[in-house]
Structure formats: C-alpha cells, structure tokens
C-alpha cells in the first residue's frame, strides 16, 4: 500500500482513510485538518458538526490573508477563523470511513485518535468565465488529496503525561516558597 506518504509504526492498531481529487478547496481543508489533528475521533466528529452549525470556528493560521476575525478563535490562541462548511463535511465523511474501517478491523472505536492527517494539492481543474470586450479568463478550482490514519490511544501514555505536569508544578511551587522565605 504505497499510496500513503508514510506508514504507521504499529499497523495492527491503525485504521486508514484517504480521498483523491476531492472537489473541495485545498486551503480551507488544510486549515480544518490541522485543527482536528491529535483529536480523538468523537471529539473531531463533534467539532466538525459544530463548525457546520457555526458553534466553533476553524483557526486560520497559514492561509489567513483577508480572513476576518471572530471571537470563537480565541480558544485556539488566534484571532482569525472561519467556518468552512464543505471542508468540514468532507472530513466528517472521511472520519466515518475510517471509523467503519476500524470497526471492521476490530479496533476500539472510542479510543481512536487522529495520529496523521495530510492534505495535498491535486491538479487544478480549468473552466472559463466570459469577460467584457470578448475576453475569456480562467476559472480555476483547487481540489485536494486527503489522507489520514487513526490509532488506538493507550491509557498509560496519558497518565505519564499527567505525571510529568504534576512534577513541573511541584517544582514551581517549591521555587515560589523558597523566594517567599528569603
């Protein structure tokens, strides 16, 4: 299966989904994909449904020229955001595909996390629009290829991360108490 840009580390605990030459804007889809990366499957599905309902926005970080500001982008630490409905619907359909692949493979669907998601440009499709004085201008579309894989999250990893955070906060508290004593 050489159609993916890279292969997962543990193939037995991974489910994949991909789409080629999808008629959805590349830039919007890239920003939406980066927003759901590292999310759990259920959270990503809820997020994409909220985007279509304008309850949560997609932060625009790279392709943000001319993008307006919205208050919903504050939760992402940025000011610019949009609600790309068609991109959200395409990614939601791909997540459903990956979920059915995971169910077929016997993976625990509730523990799936989006480990890898990548959006590439597909060849542009050319149409024409008619202008004044007999001129014709191109009317291009920017389709994209999307690939993703989801892996089962291990509960031990989450506990290890929380343990590290506690140690850091303990160190900060100790430092503040030493300063207060001096």
Curated annotation (Swiss-Prot):
<feature type="region of interest" description="Disordered">
    <location>
        <begin position="155"/>
        <end position="182"/>
    </location>
</feature>
<dbReference type="InterPro" id="IPR005721">
    <property type="entry name" value="Ribosomal_uL22_euk/arc"/>
</dbReference>
<dbReference type="InterPro" id="IPR036394">
    <property type="entry name" value="Ribosomal_uL22_sf"/>
</dbReference>
<keyword id="KW-0689">Ribosomal protein</keyword>
<dbReference type="InterPro" id="IPR001063">
    <property type="entry name" value="Ribosomal_uL22"/>
</dbReference>
<dbReference type="GO" id="GO:0003735">
    <property type="term" value="F:structural constituent of ribosome"/>
</dbReference>
<dbReference type="GO" id="GO:0002181">
    <property type="term" value="P:cytoplasmic translation"/>
</dbReference>
<dbReference type="GO" id="GO:0022625">
    <property type="term" value="C:cytosolic large ribosomal subunit"/>
</dbReference>
<protein>
    <recommendedName>
        <fullName>Large ribosomal subunit protein uL22</fullName>
    </recommendedName>
</protein>
<dbReference type="Pfam" id="PF00237">
    <property type="entry name" value="Ribosomal_L22"/>
</dbReference>
<dbReference type="InterPro" id="IPR018260">
    <property type="entry name" value="Ribosomal_uL22_CS"/>
</dbReference>
<comment type="similarity">
    <text>Belongs to the universal ribosomal protein uL22 family.</text>
</comment>
<keyword id="KW-0687">Ribonucleoprotein</keyword>
């Amino acid at each position: 299966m050489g159609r993916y840009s890279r292969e997962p580390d543990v193939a037995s605990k991974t489910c994949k989904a991909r789409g080629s030459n999808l008629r959805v804007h590349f830039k919007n889809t890239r920003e939406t994909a980066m927003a759901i990366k590292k999310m759990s499957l259920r959270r990503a599905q809820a997020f994409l449904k909220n985007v279509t309902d304008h309850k949560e926005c997609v932060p625009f970080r790279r392709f943000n020229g001319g993008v307006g500001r919205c208050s919903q982008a504050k939760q992402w630490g940025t000011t610019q955001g949009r609600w790309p409905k068609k991109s959200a619907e395409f990614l939601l359909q791909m997540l459903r595909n990956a979920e059915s692949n995971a169910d077929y493979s016997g993976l625990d669907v509730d523990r799936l996390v989006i480990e890898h998601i990548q959006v590439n440009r597909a060849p542009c499709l050319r149409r024409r629009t008619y202008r004044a004085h007999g001129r014709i201008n191109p009317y291009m579309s920017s389709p994209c290829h999307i690939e993703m894989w989801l892996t089962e999250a291990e509960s031990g990893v989450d506990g290890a991360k929380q343990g590290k955070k506690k140690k850091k906060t303990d160190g900060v508290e100790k430092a503040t108490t030493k300063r207060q004593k001096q």
